[in-house]
C-alpha cells in the first residue's frame, strides 16, 4: 500500500533540505555557526507558519537570537527556491532530544557493570 503524504509534510521536508543548505553556505551571521543541524520542520495546515527544530553543539541563547535575526533572510531565500505562493514565517525551536538521548545513554552506561572482554579472560599458564 502506498503511503500518502500531505502537502504540508512535503513542503516541510523541502524547507528542511533548503534551510540546511542555506544555514551551511549562505548565512554570514557569526552567531549562527555552520554546525547547526535542522532536525525537523513542522508546517501549519494553512502553511503560514513553520516551526524549525534545530540542534547545535553549543545551543546558546546567542545562537537562538542569531537564527531569529536571520529568519527574514532565510525566508526570502526560500521564496526564491520554492514554488510557493506564500512562504511560511519561520519560528526556531531548540531540539533538546539529542542532549536528552546522550544523557540517558550515559546514565545507562554508568548503571550497567562493565562487560569483560572474552579474550582477556584466559590467563597464561
Curated annotation (Swiss-Prot):
Short name of one Pfam family: RBFA
Keywords assigned by UniProt, alphabetized: Cytoplasm, Ribosome biogenesis
Subcellular location: Cytoplasm
GO term, biological process aspect, one: maturation of SSU-rRNA
GO CC, one annotated term: cytosol
InterPro entries the record matches: KH_dom-like_a/b (IPR015946), RbfA (IPR000238), RbfA_dom_sf (IPR023799), Ribosome-bd_factorA_CS (IPR020053)
NCBIfam families, alphabetized: rbfA
PANTHER family: RIBOSOME-BINDING FACTOR A, CHLOROPLASTIC-RELATED (PTHR33515:SF1)
Function of the protein: One of several proteins that assist in the late maturation steps of the functional core of the 30S ribosomal subunit. Associates with free 30S ribosomal subunits (but not with 30S subunits that are part of 70S ribosomes or polysomes). Required for efficient processing of 16S rRNA. May interact with the 5'-terminal helix region of 16S rRNA.
Subunit structure: Monomer. Binds 30S ribosomal subunits, but not 50S ribosomal subunits or 70S ribosomes.
Name of the protein described by the UniProt record: Ribosome-binding factor A
Amino acid at each position: 500500500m502506498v503511503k500518502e503524504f500531505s502537502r504540508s509534510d512535503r513542503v516541510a521536508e523541502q524547507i528542511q533540505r533548503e534551510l540546511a543548505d542555506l544555514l551551511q553556505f549562505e548565512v554570514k551571521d557569526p552567531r549562527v555557526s555552520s554546525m547547526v543541524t535542522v532536525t525537523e520542520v513542522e508546517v501549519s495546515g494553512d502553511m503560514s507558519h513553520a516551526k524549525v527544530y534545530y540542534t547545535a553543539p553549543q545551543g546558546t541563547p546567542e545562537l537562538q537570537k542569531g537564527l531569529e535575526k536571520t529568519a527574514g533572510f532565510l525566508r526570502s531565500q526560500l521564496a526564491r527556491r520554492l514554488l510557493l505562493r506564500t512562504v511560511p514565517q519561520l519560528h526556531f525551536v531548540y531540539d533538546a532530544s539529542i542532549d536528552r538521548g546522550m544523557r540517558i545513554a550515559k546514565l545507562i552506561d554508568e548503571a550497567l557493570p562493565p562487560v569483560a572482554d572474552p579474550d582477556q579472560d584466559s590467563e597464561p599458564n
